[in-house]
């Protein structure tokens, strides 16, 4: 395997991984669990300091196994019973007794959450104290990327700044990667080298089934399924894509105790990169090898596009994740590379106005809408229809991706600020 392809696999294995619950509150849970481990006993008080963007994405989403919403319960539960060795699955084995103990800490005013001014989009600092010691853990740049630990005010760990950071914000820096090179890698790599990506199907389809079997959030997936059964809507590939993607997001945002295979720090975006591709593969009876190659396009393509702008911005990442999914769907349908590029262009043209106003139950609607856009855009591309140069869409897909990055990075910070202020008011 050439060295560039090895880098691609390292990227995928670094940011396409299982995550239990929305990754922003889980970030606080993880930091709190590490702080408790440093203390050697359960804390008596917990102070949580987070960036505006992490605050935004934690306000309205349920924390798995708790039945509750927000950063306070996430941090308290992580401190009381979290497993610091489990990363994004830190709360996988939390018990009802531990949740009740965490809630008691909150009820007694022992857990305080504050916003902290920082240039980092992903930032969380937790200070946990007991009668004897104080432990402080700082995460910055990635949901589990610890950059500093302090015990009783003394630094006991700091991330070596000379080492490459496994940050979601810099994952593609210095890597020779384009849509064309992703396509070549996906279609030419040895199957044995990429088949690990198939776990995405197992996890995210299980999450979708959970969302169909049980009531979570807005029940977007269940509602569409019920109306098909009533005859109000027709069953089709398009409806299957909408139902399963929405149901998976319903379950995830509603606190289901099943992990999602995340993409670039987001479970919803992992769903958006996975389920439409699975449904397209099922329709064409694609084998595991074909599906794995399609997953490489959707997951690595999404990572590449999103590397052009900061994580947790005012832009909904599902909008461009679905563009990469559309690329993969064209491939599964027997389309050409040029048609796959057209699918990306079409999707971005359709979804580029979608904002992020925090992680919550309505994400299921955005995930479903993005998935439907991927399907629509793939069909247009397969029939040789591509949007012309207009708006943020350029003649070349690479320039379009750069335009999206510019729009978000330069044009949307004020929008993000206003969204956060509205939510906090």
Swiss-Prot record:
It comes from the Bacteria. GO terms for biological process: L-cysteine catabolic process to pyruvate. GO terms for molecular function: L-cysteine desulfhydrase activity. Transmembrane segments: none annotated. It holds the Pfam family SDH_alpha. HAMAP family: UPF0597. Belongs to the UPF0597 family. This is UPF0597 protein VFMJ11_0655.
């Amino acid at each position: 395997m050439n060295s560039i392809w090895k880098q691609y696999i390292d990227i995928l294995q670094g940011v396409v991984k299982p995550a239990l619950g929305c990754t922003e509150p889980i970030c606080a849970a993880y930091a709190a669990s590490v702080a408790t481990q440093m203390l050697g006993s359960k804390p008596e008080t917990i102070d949580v300091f987070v960036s505006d963007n992490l605050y935004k994405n934690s306000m309205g989403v349920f924390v798995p196994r708790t039945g509750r919403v927000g950063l306070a319960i996430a941090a308290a539960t992580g401190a009381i019973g979290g497993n610091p060795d489990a990363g994004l699955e830190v709360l996988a084995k939390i018990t009802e007794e531990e949740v009740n103990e965490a809630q008691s800490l909150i009820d007694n005013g022992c857990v305080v959450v504050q916003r902290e001014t920082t240039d980092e989009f992903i930032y969380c600092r937790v200070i946990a104290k007991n009668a004897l010691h104080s432990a402080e853990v700082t995460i910055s740049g990635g949901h589990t990327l610890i950059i500093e630990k302090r015990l009783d005010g003394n630094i006991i760990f700091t991330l070596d700044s000379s080492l490459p950071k496994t940050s979601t914000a810099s994952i593609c820096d210095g890597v020779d990667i384009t849509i064309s090179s992703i396509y070549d890698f996906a279609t030419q790599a040895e199957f044995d080298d990429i088949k690990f990506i198939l776990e995405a199907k197992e996890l995210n389809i299980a999450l979708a089934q959970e969302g169909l079997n049980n009531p979570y959030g807005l029940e977007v997936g269940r509602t569409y399924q019920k109306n098909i059964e009533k005859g109000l809507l027709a069953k089709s590939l398009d409806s299957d894509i909408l139902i399963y993607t929405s149901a998976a997001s319903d379950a995830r945002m509603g606190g289901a105790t099943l992990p999602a295979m995340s993409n670039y720090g987001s479970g919803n975006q992992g769903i958006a990169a996975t389920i439409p591709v699975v449904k397209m593969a099922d329709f064409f009876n694609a084998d595991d090898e074909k599906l794995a190659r399609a997953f490489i396009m959707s997951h690595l393509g999404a990572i590449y596009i999103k590397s052009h702008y900061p994580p947790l911005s005012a832009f909904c990442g599902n909008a461009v994740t679905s563009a990469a999914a559309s690329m993969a769907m064209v491939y599964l349908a027997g389309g050409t590379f040029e048609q796959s590029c057209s699918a990306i262009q079409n999707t971005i043209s359709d979804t580029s106005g979608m904002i992020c106003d925090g992680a919550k139950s309505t994400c299921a609607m955005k995930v479903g809408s993005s998935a439907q856009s991927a399907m629509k855009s793939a069909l247009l591309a397969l029939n040789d229809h591509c949007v012309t140069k207009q708006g943020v869409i350029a003649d070349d897909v690479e320039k379009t991706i750069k335009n999206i990055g510019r729009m978000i990075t330069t044009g949307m910070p004020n929008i993000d600020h206003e969204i956060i202020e509205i939510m906090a008011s």
